[in-house]
Structures are given as C-alpha cells and as structure tokens.
C-alpha cells in the first residue's frame, strides 16, 4: 500500500465528494467535515493516515481538551475521523479505524434558550406591514422556521413544489435525505403567498426553482439568512444572537409545553434517534396535524380559515 498516495489533499477531497454525491449530505455538513479534517491534519502533523494509531487519536483528543474545546466539539472531531477512516478502509487505503473506540469527555447538554410566545409574536407580527420584496421573503422565512421547526439547511433546500398551499402542507428533505410531511399554519401560508406574489421580481433565470432566492435571483445561502434574522431581531428589540435554530427550538418547546406529546414533536422535528425512530414511524400525518392544530400558537390551519 502506498502510504503517500492517500496522505494528500486529494484523498480528503475525494472523501468530501463522496459525502456530497453518494451520501448526499448538505454543503454545510460537508464543510464541517472538511474543517475537522484540516484541523486534525494540523494537530497530527504529516504522519500518513494509515499509520495513525489509537494512541494518536487519544493524543489528538487530549490536545483539543487542553485547547479548551468542549466535549461536544471533540466528539464531533472524532466522529468525523471515524467516518473518514471507514471510507479509507472501504477504499483499501487503511487497515483499521484507530478512532473507533475513542470517546471525548462528556459535556452537559445545553439546549438553546427558546423565545417565549410573546417574543415570537413580536418578531413575526412586527414585519407584516412591510411590502418590500426582501421584507416579504424574510417574513415568509421566519414564519416557516417557527411554524414548521425547520433546520436552516431544510429551509434553504425548499423548492417551489415543496409547499402545497391548498393542502397546507410542506414536504421537507432532512438529514440523510429523509423526507417528512409537515402541516403549515395560516400565518406562514399567508406569508408564503405574499412572498410568491413578488418573487418574480427577483428572478433572473426561468429555471430557478428555489422557494427562497436572493436579490440576485440565486438560492439563498446560510449566512444570508443568519444575518437577516439577526438584523430583524435587532430592529424589533430582541436578542441580537437570534439564529434559525433558536426558532426551531422555540417551535419544539412551545408545542411540547402545550401538547405533552413528545413523540409527535420529535416526528415533526425530523429527529433520527436510532433508539426511538421506529416509534415515530407509526405516527401518521393526520395525528401529527391534529397535534399541531391543537398545540401550535400560530396553527389555525382549518380550510375555512384559509378562505
């Protein structure tokens, strides 16, 4: 085995291509793998991948710990390396996986703070009078993030045919390319309809099917949404650190507090917990829609309300 042949940037690039094309991971996730591998390579030095040992992996984890990295960050790095070494073994470029049994120090689980219902209402209701195209787009984005508990990557991957305005439903592609069907409340539907009326003003290419586009007619980037959300939060006197995942967490918190139905909430969130996924698959859409209608502060998705 030629150690140098896979100890190059090309090997890492090939692995990243594999993640994007074969495993169909989002660009954001692939970039995370890339950052982890670059940092690991820096800390491990020039030693070929196939000569690294369990001791090297423990030393890497210890080095990250000394740098003050959290247990979660170290575990993510080790997870990246385990995945990378599995790929190398599959390609015949490594004999074993030295990261397989290495565990990072446990860190306490800290959930992001949720906005309360009044704060969410202030955030969303304050922008309903602005008819500028970008403002209408941002309003639809914020409404959907909270109405459906979307991950940022899920929001950005939405296409025009992802939402059924008549049936008040959204088809979302989540982690692992898994799809789920979500009910959508009246305020979010109204916001999306208003956005779709002005969306043609920003279109530069007739084949652009992204639901949310930039002022240049391209599919929105994660940083654009994050920056716009922070801007709207500041304008409305809310936490400057407001980010898309905080709206997702607020969605989950408010539904769980109102319904107490943990299984339905986790199904709506698209969580893929190996220990509990089988339970969630038995919940049908009608049950999820009923939980949503009865518990979500901005639901009201009955057909007669939509007229």
Swiss-Prot record:
Gene Ontology, cellular component aspect: cytoplasm
Domain Tyr recombinase: from-to ranges: 110-293
Compartments where located: Cytoplasm
One of the protein's GO biological processes: chromosome segregation
Gene3D superfamilies: 1.10.150.130, Intergrase catalytic core (1.10.443.10)
Keyword line: Cell cycle, Cell division, Chromosome partition, Cytoplasm, DNA integration, DNA recombination, DNA-binding
Keyword set includes Cell cycle: yes
Active site location: 151, 175, 245, 248, 271, 280 (o-(3'-phospho-dna)-tyrosine intermediate)
Annotated Core-binding (CB) domain residues: 6-89
Coarse class of the protein's main subcellular location: cytoplasm
Assigned protein family: Belongs to the 'phage' integrase family. XerC subfamily.
Subunit organization: Forms a cyclic heterotetrameric complex composed of two molecules of XerC and two molecules of XerD.
NCBIfam families: PRK00283.1 (NF001399), recomb_XerC (TIGR02224)
Function description: Site-specific tyrosine recombinase, which acts by catalyzing the cutting and rejoining of the recombining DNA molecules. The XerC-XerD complex is essential to convert dimers of the bacterial chromosome into monomers to permit their segregation at cell division. It also contributes to the segregational stability of plasmids.
Name this polypeptide is given: Tyrosine recombinase XerC
Lineage: Bacteria, Pseudomonadati, Pseudomonadota, Gammaproteobacteria, Oceanospirillales
């Amino acid at each position: 085995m030629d150690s140098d042949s896979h100890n190059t940037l090309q090997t890492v690039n090939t692995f990243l291509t594999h993640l994007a094309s074969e495993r169909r991971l989002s660009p954001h996730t692939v970039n995370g793998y890339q950052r982890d591998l670059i940092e690991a390579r820096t800390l491990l030095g020039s030693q070929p991948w196939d000569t690294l040992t369990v001791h090297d992996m423990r030393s890497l984890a210890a080095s990250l710990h000394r740098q003050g990295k959290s247990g979660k960050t170290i575990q993510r790095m080790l997870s990246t390396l385990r995945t990378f070494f599995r790929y190398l073994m599959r390609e015949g470029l490594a004999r074993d996986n030295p990261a397989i049994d290495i565990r990072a120090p446990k860190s306490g689980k800290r959930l992001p703070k949720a906005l309360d219902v009044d704060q969410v209402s202030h955030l969303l209701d304050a922008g309903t009078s602005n008819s500028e195209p970008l403002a209408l787009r941002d309003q639809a984005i914020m409404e959907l993030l909270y109405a459906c508990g979307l991950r940022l990557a899920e929001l950005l991957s939405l296409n025009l045919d992802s939402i059924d305005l008549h049936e008040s439903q959204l088809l979302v592609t989540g982690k692992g390319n898994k799809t789920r069907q979500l009910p959508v409340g009246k305020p979010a539907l109204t916001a999306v309809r208003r956005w779709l009326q002005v969306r043609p003003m920003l279109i530069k290419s007739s084949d652009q099917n992204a639901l949310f586009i930039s002022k240049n007619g391209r599919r929105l980037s994660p940083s654009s949404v994050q920056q716009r959300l922070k801007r709207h939060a500041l304008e409305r006197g809310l936490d400057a650190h407001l980010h898309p995942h905080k709206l997702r967490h607020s969605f989950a918190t408010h539904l769980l507090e109102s319904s107490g139905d943990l299984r339905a909430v986790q199904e709506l969130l698209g969580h893929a917990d190996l220990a509990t996924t089988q339970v969630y698959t038995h919940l049908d859409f009608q049950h999820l829609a009923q939980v949503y209608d009865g518990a979500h502060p901005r639901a009201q998705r009955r057909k007669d309300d939509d007229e």
